[in-house]
């Protein structure tokens, strides 16, 4: 990162002031809006058992049993923090995440510097440090902050690797580092592996454009070894312990042998498009009752289907778990809905899920009602959520403009395909959560920085013409 270090030295006061502001914002979230709940306890339980018993597992009725529902990246981070600061010292974890995320913003700037120029890098750094959406997740002991850090580094070294190959220069070292950071990102969240096909696409373009194909082939080999090689011990462990082939983590956070309500998951996938339904329905199963009044109209196609669905939900509310017979009924309803309108299931619903993950107000960690559009119920919270959504839209539109006005070359193929691949994959999930798109923000903020430079150039040109 010699170019970035040189830029920081030339503009040390700017970077110092922005860094202080960014760290202050993150510490504000840590101490004002800490969010220690949900998956935090799962990660924490695994970390403690790993430390205390040497078992990567969960506590079940007082005993520790091995698990594969989470990859070892974030539990390993928590275990290290617990070993230094004490068990379940989540405040120390969140402060560490605030420091890590503040530093990660420099990598955002480095990506912008490689894609465009120094002014774009400075603008991207300012936008990144003051971005409340990534900053707020430092106040949650979840994998997002470290996942963003790993993906940012993988993007940076991948962009540098692409540029080196474009100039027919050896790039094995750069692609090796990119692969290691990609592996680290996968260990935080398995969907971060989507960066690898984006890298592969860029390498494929270079392979067919450049005469020196040996450099490209060697880069592909190094990338494959460094990104997938670290997964081998985890895969072997899962085979030895569970006798299953699982190089990542189970899709539905279930261990081998546990009952999985596939029919229920299929049913919600035929209508669920927004985060509020995830909170009110998806996360309730199993253990909490479902309020049928909170189901949207799109969850039903016919009156008989409506009555059958409510009857199944009523039975679930009596026992608060889904048994195989009930799951089969959900599957039958889902199958009929899919047959009734296959295009809705394949095209329209995935599109709406993607739109919700990108555009809804990112207030899920704040004390703001999820049903933000119900102004009559909570007017102040709704106006705040609307402002938050506007700020999110501002970042996205700025990134879109930055992409359109910049000449990114094959590096652009890499970063844009990463966003498109991630969006396409996540649209196939039945539970759209806004946090799933945060790993795209290194690209969003880097391109947004380029947009501001173009605006500044236009203002200067207009001023010169006026004078």
PLM region spans:
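Transmembrane-helix motifs of polytopic, lipid-linked glycan transferases
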Residues: 95-116, 153, 157, 397-401
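Extracytosolic helix-loop segments that constitute the early lumenal/periplasmic catalytic or substrate-binding loops
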Residues: 41-66, 73-76, 80
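Short acidic/glycine- and proline-prone juxtamembrane loop motifs at membrane-interface regions
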Residues: 36-37, 133, 139-146, 191
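Short helix- or helix-capping micro-motifs
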Residues: 22-25, 124-132, 153-156, 182-186
């Amino acid at each position: 990162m010699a170019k970035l270090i040189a830029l920081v030295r030339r503009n040390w006061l700017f970077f110092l002031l922005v860094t202080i502001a960014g760290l202050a914002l993150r510490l504000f979230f840590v101490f004002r809006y800490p969010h220690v709940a949900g998956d935090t306890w799962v990660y924490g339980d695994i970390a403690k058992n790993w430390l205390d018993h040497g078992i990567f597992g969960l506590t079940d009725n007082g005993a520790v049993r091995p698990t594969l529902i989470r990859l070892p990246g974030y539990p390993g981070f928590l275990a290290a923090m617990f070993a230094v600061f004490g068990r379940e010292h989540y405040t120390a974890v969140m402060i560490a995440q605030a420091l890590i995320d503040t530093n990660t913003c420099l990598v955002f700037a480095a990506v912008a510097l490689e894609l465009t120029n120094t002014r774009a890098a400075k603008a991207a750094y300012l936008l990144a440090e003051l971005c409340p959406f990534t900053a707020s997740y430092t106040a949650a002991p979840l994998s997002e902050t470290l996942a963003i850090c790993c993906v940012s580094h993988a993007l940076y070294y991948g962009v540098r690797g692409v540029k080196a190959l474009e100039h027919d220069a050896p790039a094995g070292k750069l692609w090796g580092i990119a692969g290691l950071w990609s592996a680290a990102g996968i260990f935080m969240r398995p969907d971060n592996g989507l960066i690898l096909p984006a890298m592969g696409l860029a390498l494929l373009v270079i392979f067919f454009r450049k005469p020196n194909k040996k450099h490209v082939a060697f880069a592909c080999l190094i990338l494959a070894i460094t990104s997938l090689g670290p997964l081998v011990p985890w895969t072997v462990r899962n085979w030895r312990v569970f006798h299953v082939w699982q190089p990542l983590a189970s899709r539905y956070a279930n261990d081998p042998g546990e009952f999985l309500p596939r029919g229920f998951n299929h049913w919600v996938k035929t209508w669920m498009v927004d985060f509020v339904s995830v909170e009110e329905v998806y996360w309730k199963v199993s253990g909490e009752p479902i309020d049928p009044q909170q189901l949207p109209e799109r969850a039903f196609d016919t009156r008989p289907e409506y009555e059958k669905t409510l009857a199944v939900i009523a039975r679930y509310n009596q026992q608060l778990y889904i048994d195989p017979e009930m799951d089969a009924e959900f599957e039958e309803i889902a199958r009929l809905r899919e047959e009734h309108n296959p295009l809705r299931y394949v095209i329209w619903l995935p599109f709406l899920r993607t739109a919700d993950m990108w555009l809804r107000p990112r207030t899920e960690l704040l004390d703001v009602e999820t049903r933000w559009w119900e102004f009559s119920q909570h007017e102040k919270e709704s106006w705040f959520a609307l402002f938050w959504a506007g700020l999110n839209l501002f970042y996205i539109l700025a990134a879109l403009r930055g992409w359109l006005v910049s000449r990114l070359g094959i590096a652009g193929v890499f970063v844009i395909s990463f966003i498109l691949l991630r969006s396409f994959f996540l649209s196939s999930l039945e539970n759209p959560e806004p946090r799933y798109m945060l790993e795209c923000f290194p690209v969003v903020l880097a391109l947004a920085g380029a947009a501001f430079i173009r605006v500044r150039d236009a203002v200067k040109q207009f001023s010169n013409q006026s004078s």
